[in-house]
């Protein structure tokens, strides 16, 4: 199994902070957002990681290298200046992902997780989602759960 980290975005909501540093390289304590994700992915047993890049992508590529220092193999899907969005970024990286299920993570996710993803896809599941509680300012959220499974996905207005 492989993982893909979405790291091509501009990070515009962070204002001037991302003018010279891409959001995935934002430091929290002694690590960057993207390194935290790489370590969590590795801890879950996955060693092949594809990372899409665009905005300041060369800095991400230079910082992470081939993944050897994280005991993983990193392959980059460079979107150039186009920023293809989530779906376009995945589509652009399909040659690197093969046809097997893969783990998809946003580069700006910062949490501790360790999932045996190989055991979570059962009974014809198309995906396994890790969701977080809704913040107080958005109590309804985008998903509804029934018996621990996503049953409704609200459309964005």
Where do the model's predicted regions map?
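Short glycine-/acidic-enriched loop or helix-start segments at secondary-structure transitions
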Residues: 15-16, 37, 61-63, 87, ...
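Short catalytic helix/loop segments, enriched in acidic residues and glycine
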Residues: 20-35
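Residues at the C-termini of beta-strands that transition into short coil/loop
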Residues: 7, 29, 78-80, 131-132, ...
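Conserved beta-strand segments of alpha/beta enzyme cores
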Residues: 24, 73-75, 126
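Conserved core of the sugar-phosphate nucleotidyltransferase
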Residues: 111-157
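Conserved N-terminal catalytic core of the sugar/cofactor nucleotidyltransferase
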Residues: 2-5, 31-106
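N-terminal nucleotide-binding beta1-loop-alpha1 segment
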Residues: 1-19
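Active-site metal-binding loops of divalent metal-dependent hydrolases
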Residues: 10, 107-109, 134
